[in-house]
């Protein structure tokens, strides 16, 4: 009987631990913040599908911005964050449509790109905008890694022009986000 009780006790402890970790992961946005692993942004060698890999990654990147903006648009109280979310939700679909068109025209590929997993920003509180800014900063830094990689490997003019435009935009807005974070949160 004591052997069964010990086994049962250990099993219950393991189950409780797993449940606790799961609840912590779901409810604490910081567990998900490391989703932008910059070590995984390499497009590999310059072969015939290099540009396709960039296109798919950039579609997912733009969708990630939209998912973050959608979450923020209903939570934030700051006018700057509301305007930023509205701008993202207005502009990103056009960029995505252009990338899908290139994908279809150049590769005959009409497969939809899977949405990325983005950080859970949590419910509104005094640190909500900080979480949103941190997520956008990480998102932009990942995008910059992508544009740097593709500009050293691709020879297609449209891809290089896209990467240059994205790089310029990301650098400009990254500075703005860091300025807001410093002004609002002294970080």
Please give the residue ranges for each predicted region.
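N-terminal Sec-pathway targeting helices
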Residues: 1-16
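All-alpha RGS (Regulator of G-protein Signaling) helical domain and cognate RGS-like helical scaffolds
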Residues: 15-16, 20-187
